[in-house]
From Swiss-Prot:
UniProt keywords, alphabetically: Lyase, Magnesium, Metal-binding
Domain notes: The Asp-Asp-Xaa-Xaa-Asp/Glu (DDXXD/E) motif is important for the catalytic activity, presumably through binding to Mg(2+).
The EC number(s) this enzyme carries: 4.2.3.-
Top-level taxon in the UniProt lineage: Eukaryota
Keyword Metal-binding set for record: yes
Protein name: Probable terpene synthase 9
Pfam family, one: Terpene_synth_C
Required cofactor names: Mg(2+)
Length: 584
């Protein structure tokens, strides 16, 4: 079925409606097909377009050509010898969990190693049961007490901050005898980042352990513990992107004298097998990205398929969430191009039109859009239809109202920023964040991910989003703050809207350093709220982890600047060892 418009820009637009329906469906009235999603292809023959001054961000070309991605190879596969060996190793490691039943410290160390090696998802039920039952003696040392505290909070269990009181003197300060206990101090430091508001002892623990670890570093001999201390002081364990931590910790664990060879082999094999899943997903995504046509049609936007996949992998790395990662990557790829359209390329009147058209959610709205926006508009509708259809088919859950609302809210937030820029308006810090936590796309990404985590009904999904709002909000705010710290200078140079740092500088009349310190303070504040919400939250740990992991991924991507816009360097290196290079 074809619909032909006569465009106001003297172009002819052909829209072909493609029904994704069972083979036996026959042509008939459109109402007969209302239960199936509509997919659209676009062919535009434009005679001319209105000449407008267009800005450019001058993004470098992709360093990951989609055709090269399709050539990724690995000898690892779940079939045959590797799959059989994986199962055998899982059985061996599972038996280890029962070996230490009378040694709580041994159990806790094993669980911690499993988590940091990236294999704990195989033993989730066993780990939860152990953590629910394990109790420490009153004379347990600093290392074990802090490790126990951290693991319980990470898994959503309630544990009091008072467990650290025994390590303080009568004057309330941590004992001098702890100052040489480097493993205990590192464990205390890691635990302190699971603190909540009002837990002053954990703030004191953070200050004390930080000071002592820095002092010990000055006298260290460069061993493996020293390396871990440097790593912790650079990025706290609780803030690290999981998959990068897994790769790094495998290298650390194999150098430890007390490592378990079966667990080490499992970690390496599992890492390589999961990497093979990532490569399969990326090959599918590379074909989709080429077919989408953004690379040829939208020269102003970032071509960053691999880097966008890093976001998805960071949010949810386990192999059985493959479909979630694929849809998240598609979402982020389209979002990035739409973001560039609002930030850089589109004129304000065009952006007003696009936002209005998206509210209508109707392919007929294409007639009023300039040619370059048509492909963006249809990409959103096609993607949403594909996702909604898949979730409806697999889960029986109808998500279109939620998905549509997220896209509309996102573009409305983009439009607010475009209006600010075009009018020369500088918002206050609070006014900026009120809009920017939405425009960063975190809320929208989590809603898309949640649609693929499995729900029993539309009401269940709605309640999920309602009761998880605080987690979604604070994790999205953290993404925005990390983004601004890493990208604000580059975005200001290319003429983008002011970011939180500039808003605070102008509003308060302070230096850039003071503004950045304020943002860093807000990041610490937000993490404390997240810690509390992740324990209070009665929703699935998969949902909680997606929220936390999105924040961790943002910290990773923007740690050294704009890891997406300028992805040559650290981002490239990380993608190579996460996706391309197996562990030998």
């Amino acid at each position: 079925m074809e619909i032909v418009f006569s465009s106001s820009l003297s172009s002819t637009l052909t829209v072909t409606k493609i029904l994704r329906s069972p083979r036996h469906a026959t042509t008939g009235n459109m109402q007969d097909y209302s239960r199936f999603p509509l997919f659209f292809t676009i062919a535009s023959r434009s005679n001319a377009s209105q000449a407008k001054h267009r800005r450019s961000a001058n993004y470098h070309p992709t360093i990951w050509d989609p055709k090269a991605i399709e050539c990724l190879r690995t000898p690892y596969t779940y079939d045959g010898v590797h799959g059989a060996r994986l199962q055998k190793l899982k059985d061996e490691v599972r038996s280890l969990l029962t070996t230490f039943t009378k040694e709580p410290c041994g159990q806790l160390k094993l669980i911690d190693s499993m988590q940091r090696l990236g294999v704990s998802y195989h033993f989730r039920e066993e780990i939860e049961e152990i953590l629910n039952l394990v109790e420490l003696d009153s004379d347990s040392d600093l290392y074990t007490t802090a490790l126990h505290f951290r693991l319980l909070r990470q898994h959503g269990f309630t544990i009091s901050k008072e467990v650290f009181e025994k390590f303080r003197n009568e004057d309330g300060k941590f004992k001098d005898s702890l100052k040489e206990d480097i493993l205990g101090l590192l464990s205390l430091y890691d635990a302190s980042y699971l603190g909540m508001h009002g837990e002053h002892i954990l703030e004191e623990a953070k200050d004390f352990s930080t000071e002592q670890l820095k002092s010990l570093l000055g006298r260290s001999q460069g061993d493996i513990v020293t390396y871990q201390v440097k790593q912790a002081l650079d990025v706290p364990l609780h803030w690290r992107m999981q998959r990068i931590e897994n790769r790094n910790y495998i290298n650390i664990y194999q150098k430890e004298d007390t490592n378990n060879l079966a667990l080490l082999e499992l970690a390496k094999l599992d890492y390589n097998l999961v990497q093979s899943v990532y490569q399969i997903e990326l090959k599918e995504l590379a074909r989709w990205w080429i077919a989408l046509g953004f690379r040829e049609k939208l020269h102003f936007s970032r071509d960053r398929l691999m880097e966008n996949y890093l976001w998805s992998m960071g949010m949810i790395f386990e192999p059985h969430f493959s479909k979630c990662r694929i849809y998240l990557t598609k979402f982020i790829c389209i979002l990035s191009s739409i973001d560039d359209m609002y930030d850089i390329y589109g004129s304000l009147d065009e952006l007003e039109l696009f936002t209005s058209a998206l509210k209508r959610w109707d392919p007929m709205a294409l007639e009023e859009l300039p040619d370059y926006m048509k492909i963006c508009y249809l990409a959103i509708l096609n993607f949403a239809s594909e996702l909604v259809y898949d979730v409806l088919k697999e889960e029986g859950l109808y998500t279109l109202p939620f998905i549509r609302d997220e896209w509309v809210k996102l573009c409305q937030a983009y439009l607010v920023e475009a209006r600010w820029f075009n009018s020369g308006y500088t918002p206050t810090f609070d006014e900026y964040l009120e809009n920017a936590w939405i425009s960063v796309g975190g809320h929208e990404a989590i809603v898309h991910a949640c649609a693929l985590l499995g729900h029993t009904s539309t009401e269940d999904f709605q309640n999920f989003l309602k009761h998880g709002f605080e987690l979604i909000y604070w994790s999205s705010l953290l993404v925005r703050l990390n983004d601004d710290l890493g990208t604000s200078q580059a975005e200001i140079k290319r003429g983008d809207v002011v970011k939180s740092i500039q808003c605070y500088m102008i509003e308060k009349g302070v230096s850039e350093k003071e503004a950045k310190d304020h943002v860093k303070g807000l990041i610490s504040h937000a993490w404390k709220v997240l810690n509390e919400e992740s324990v209070k939250c009665s929703l699935s740990r998969s949902f909680v982890n997606v929220c936390l992991n999105m924040t961790r991924t943002a910290q990773c991507i923007f740690q050294y600047g704009d890891g997406i816009g300028t992805s040559i360097g650290v981002t490239k290196d990380r993608l190579e060892f996460l996706i391309v290079k197996p562990i030998l």
